[in-house]
């Protein structure tokens, strides 16, 4: 979709249930930027960094690919990959919210939690969903599925 951009980061590999061990490795002190939840290779390895710096890097890539302007409305999803605490995810959300509000972008219906995970993988993804009136209405509609529920009407 032209209105959604996502990028994730992995701090540790996922465990493959059938074999009981990681299917890949990430060197100590490194993170993999852009890694997929199934272990698909990312775009680069980087040294570990504070959350605010990591968010700056990820948001820079997202906003470079999908520029936003003063007055835009977005929904944000901070998705934990399976072994990242909710507290850590909210630290990421705080940094995303600060950055977006700084350019005049409003966040509607933020989602922070584990929505799509991998076994024991530490990391998270940031998804930005640019809304128009129709999309915002659809996002607010009731939804009950195994992986996503919205009954906040």
Question: What do the PLM-derived regions correspond to, one by one?
Answer:
Residues 1-91:
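Mixed-charge interfacial surface used for oligomerization/domain docking
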